[in-house]
Amino acid sequence: MASAAEQLASNLNFSTFAKAEDLKKRLWFTLGALLVYRLGTYIPLPGLNPEAFAQAFQGQSGGILGLFNMFSGGAVQRMAIFALGIMPYISASIIVQLMTSVVPALEQLKKEGEQGRKIINQYTRYGTVLLGTAQAYAIAAGLESGNGLVNDPGWFFRISTVISLLGGTMFLMWLGEQITSRGIGNGISLIIFAGIVAHLPTALAGTLELGRTGALSTPLILAIIIMVVAVIALIVFVERAQRRLLIQYPKRQVGNRMFQGDTSHLPLKLNTSGVIPAIFASSLLLLPATLAGFANTATLPGWATTIVGALGHGKPLYMVLYGAMIAFFAFFYTAIVFNPKDTADNLKKHGGFIPGIRPGERTAEYIDYVLTRITVIGAVYLMFVCILPEVLISQTGVPFYLGGTSLLIVVSVTLDTVAQIQGHLIAQQYEGLIKKSKLRGGKRGR
């Protein structure tokens, strides 16, 4: 049996790609949308003093503000209209998904299929507007409290900043949805991916410059390269790993013919939640500290300054909260995307069963038992990948872009996008086979 790599090589050939017109249109649309996003990160907010802000950001870039800048694709560094990025949408998604688990009306909507999903998505958009407005106003007020950051402070600046930042977030939300429906891959993840990748050359150049000046020793740079390669290999391995449950189907009679029972597998991914826990945890941790970072620390209460300092990148409290949130969202998001009871009911409906397990409720309990245990492994893997490199990097001063979270997002989104491209190419091959069989059938009919 061919391996996944061999199947990918056989599907990703030039002749098949050249015939896949729909795939090419989707790829061009995705690239165009990401280009629009990158251009938007260079459009500055009106009324801001760019020189003063650049100087103020330079003093904060080594902290958590620099990490938020990575997720926004450099828009925070330039205080562009996309400075809020897609984080308000992600935060709203977290809140709405949590509410679907505790609010009966929303839980019922979730069970109504496509129509219910559209209503829940609309609630998420409303939540994005509310969160985006609050965060944009906090940024505007924080900028005004800075020394000389705003040319003409006042309500006009605050309103224009809120409109610009909120408009940027809503545009990115719409752009992400368009990429998902008309392009390739998950639009929201690709937007974050594009922001990180855009700054990878700068991070690599900065690391090499640190080595050239002697700030980083050659053995340390080699160790960092080995660590990055090892983390990438681990991510690829775990993201493709599966726990397969054997499914059997009994013999069945159709007319006068008896068909033998068939066997198949129910694949359970080791990391069912994917990259979502890292993105969710980052968004919740980054925003409060980032909003405080824009403000003048002299105007903050003592307790707020203490919390902001404790939540600094690489600090123990930051790592503990980050790991706890990753573990929570790994289990929470797995429960959202995979329902053992629905899977067991579908198996029972089609006559399938797990050997030694009674169909129905017992099958659902067994699937949940297996899924819970592999999710523990997935959560530990996510915490290891996201936290350990961050600890090492915080001790060496290497740019954030080489951290575990950014590597996880880049590799996971790349794997997901390549898998979707492969799916389109396979569909194109099947279409070609169907057309050939129809032509042969027509010739025989003549």
Kindly label every feature range from the protein language model.
Residues 2-110, 115-446:
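N-terminal cationic and glycine-rich segments that engage phosphates or anionic surfaces
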